[in-house]
Amino acid sequence: MPEVQTDHPETAELSKPQLRMVDLNLLTVFDAVMQEQNITRAAHVLGMSQPAVSNAVARLKVMFNDELFVRYGRGIQPTARAFQLFGSVRQALQLVQNELPGSGFEPASSERVFHLCVCSPLDSILTSQIYNHIEQIAPNIHVMFKSSLNQNTEHQLRYQETEFVISYEDFHRPEFTSVPLFKDEMVLVASKNHPTIKGPLLKHDVYNEQHAAVSLDRFASFSQPWYDTVDKQASIAYQGMAMMSVLSVVSQTHLVAIAPRWLAEEFAESLELQVLPLPLKQNSRTCYLSWHEAAGRDKGHQWMEEQLVSICKR
């Protein structure tokens, strides 16, 4: 019987890509180009010449057998493969960086930029608190804020285009961490000039009133939990883009709205609003701080996490 030839384990092992044959410096170039999505800016960040970065990108394309970056307007756009690689590469670089001597994060001198999403209506109270606190203890750090979730938020967290989200929504996927910060009491708001509402309502009366709400078409709308059936949605007479417009409309009409107590009380006097108990089972919402697990090993990220928890805990 003829003898079957098989590869020796040593031969199979040698056929695999060898890490020692890879120039790991290329990964720092990949990380910078992914973050900047512009060769010139990446070169500036790295302290390299533009031709040197372009050459490194060409070698990266060979290493990963993919284009990685394609021209887009005045910059470049990562391919699907580049996005797939980014989280793992960045996490690996952060692990190495954190172990280097003298690699501790120094907030007083750092010029790092953090991108936060503080969702409405929380932005109206937390943004100024966060901004002022960070400016006082780390004046060279820049914090960039936006105030709404969208369909791309998970993608932005995964690739650290947004580093933290503060919202009433938590992220259920195992790759995300969501830490509860506080629980907000919800109230029913009506104009002091409302012709029939002069005190607390009973549960069965709430949806007999006409309501103003944050638009249910908005991704992760603040108002969505209270209008989860067709019958409840039928009570809505006005849908606005933000809670402030909702409260303004309520103050000038016979509509009612559901809002956080702190927000309703802040504007109760100026808008002449009644702030009443909300006689529904869901009369509170938990606020969460969320981030992607890959970012949590970064010392600067850990510092900002501690600051946000300290500022926002009630």
Curated annotation (Swiss-Prot):
Disruption phenotype: Has no effect on leucine biosynthesis nor on bgl operon silencing. Residues 22-79 form the HTH lysR-type domain. One of its GO terms (molecular function) is DNA-binding transcription factor activity. Gene3D superfamilies: Periplasmic binding protein-like II, Winged helix-like DNA-binding domain superfamily/Winged helix DNA-binding domain. Transmembrane segments: none annotated. Residues 39-58 bind DNA. One of its GO terms (biological process) is regulation of DNA-templated transcription. Induction: Gene expression is repressed by H-NS, activated by itself. More highly expressed in minimal than rich medium, poorly expressed in exoponential growth, levels increase in stationary phase (at protein level). GO terms for cellular component: protein-DNA complex. InterPro entries: LysR-type_TF (IPR050389), LysR_subst-bd (IPR005119), Tscrpt_reg_HTH_LysR (IPR000847), WH-like_DNA-bd_sf (IPR036388), WH_DNA-bd_sf (IPR036390). It comes from the Bacteria. The keyword Acyltransferase does not apply. The keyword Amino-acid biosynthesis does not apply. Signal peptide: none annotated. Keywords: Activator, DNA-binding, Repressor, Transcription, Transcription regulation. It holds the Pfam family HTH_1. A global transcription factor. Activates transcription of the 9 following operons; yjjQ-bglJ, yjjP, acrEF, ybdO, yjcRQP, casABCDE12, rhsD-ybbC, fepE and gltF, in most cases it probably interferes with silencing by H-NS and activates transcription. Represses transcription of the 3 following operons; uxaCA, sdaCB and btsT. H-NS repression of the bgl operon, leading to the ability to metabolize some beta-glucosides. It also directly activates the bgl operon. Activation is H-NS and BglJ-RcsB independent. Belongs to the LysR transcriptional regulatory family. PANTHER family: HTH-TYPE TRANSCRIPTIONAL REGULATOR LEUO (PTHR30118:SF6), HTH-TYPE TRANSCRIPTIONAL REGULATOR LEUO-RELATED (PTHR30118). This is HTH-type transcriptional regulator LeuO.
